Regions:
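One-carbon transfer enzymes
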Residues: 1-168
């Protein structure tokens, strides 16, 4: 039996990268999506030159296509998903939608600054999040900038979320 994974996300560059990465792991997971704030578009991203594409390809480095919407990625893979115009990740509509999917794991890639309410953690679902920076040392949304200014390596912390912010 495959592990049931739900991507709870806004259509952000981060969520697009997650979805495109999941394409490489379809044998391990049953993948579904719940996308909210669907009328809010992802930020524009710079294009990659042909020389850069060749470099990444030659060195077997994956670089997501940030111009591909998350819905396009899910449609290409015939993955089930639900969309909501509601931008409130803590709404009953979104909580009920996640419950219907019966996920083993919810990967959260929301819009910047959004914090999940306690209601999400009163379920049997585990929530996984990737935070730029070395938690608990680097908190907030500007961790990459401060890592560079302080001449530290840029890091990402993957953690299971809990009711407490940045404490999972």
């Amino acid at each position: 039996m495959k592990y049931k994974l739900v991507l709870l996300a806004g259509d952000t560059p981060r969520a697009r990268a997650y979805a495109q990465t999941l394409q490489k792991h379809t044998e391990d997971y049953s993948i579904k999506g719940f996308f909210y704030g669907v009328n809010k578009s992802a930020a524009l991203t710079p294009s990659i030159s042909d020389a850069e594409k060749d470099f990444y390809s030659t060195n077997n480095l994956f670089i997501p296509d940030f111009n591909e919407s998350i819905l396009t990625t899910f449609n290409k893979n015939n993955w089930e998903y639900f969309t909501a115009e509601n931008k409130d990740v803590n709404s009953s509509e979104i909580l009920e939608g996640i419950a219907r999917f019966g996920a083993d794991l919810v990967v959260f890639a929301g819009f910047g600054g959004q914090i999940l309410s306690h209601s999400h953690f009163e379920t049997s679902h585990n929530y996984l999040h990737m935070h730029p920076g070395d938690l608990p040392l680097e908190r907030g949304s500007t961790t990459i900038y401060y890592s560079i200014l302080n001449r530290r390596k840029c890091t990402v912390t993957a953690f299971f979320m809990s009711k407490e912010i940045d404490a999972g």
